[in-house]
Regions:
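N-terminal interaction/assembly modules
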Residues: 1-56, 109-124
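Short alpha-helical segments used as structural interaction elements across diverse proteins
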Residues: 14, 27, 65, 90-92
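Amphipathic alpha-helical interface surfaces
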Residues: 43, 47, 62-63, 94
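Short helix-coil-helix linker/hinge
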Residues: 54-64
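Short, amphipathic alpha-helical "recognition" segments used to contact nucleic acids or chromatin
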Residues: 62-75
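Helix-turn-helix DNA-binding module
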Residues: 73-90
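DNA major-groove recognition helices of helix-turn-helix
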Residues: 91-109
Length: 124
């Protein structure tokens, strides 16, 4: 598992969350007017729990609103950004910190290997 995989699954999370929570091995979604079969890796079944843990641990209601709307409900960044009193850079900083915290939880539970962490380039 690497950070790019996590980001890709976060982009389609609203379309696959019911299948993940139902314990299915895959889901069919529509992407670019095509039906696509998405296979779920083992670590993905922890994602809903981690998201809820992060939302419960945060005190900022604006942050929880952003994550619920953009990740869980599947609204676009543009739609969510128009509804919150934040600058664009602050909005994306919140989302980046959320992704980092999710990745750290996967590391803590052993889903990310040392080689995968070292393989990710800093200067890309």
């Amino acid at each position: 598992m690497n950070k790019a995989e996590l980001k890709n699954f976060l982009l389609i999370y609203d379309k696959i969350k019911d299948s993940i929570e139902g314990g299915k091995e895959y889901a069919y979604i529509r992407r670019c007017n095509r039906k696509q079969k998405i296979m779920f890796p083992e670590w993905l079944y922890k994602l809903p729990d981690y998201i809820e843990d992060i939302l419960k641990s945060e005190d900022n209601p604006l942050f929880t609103y952003i994550i619920r709307e953009s990740v869980i409900s599947g609204k676009t960044d543009k739609q969510t950004l128009t509804e919150v009193p934040l600058s664009e850079s602050s909005y994306y900083r919140y989302k980046r910190k959320f992704e980092e915290k999710l990745y750290e939880l996967f590391i803590a539970d052993g889903y990310v290997t040392r080689e995968e962490i070292l393989k990710a380039k800093i200067a890309d």
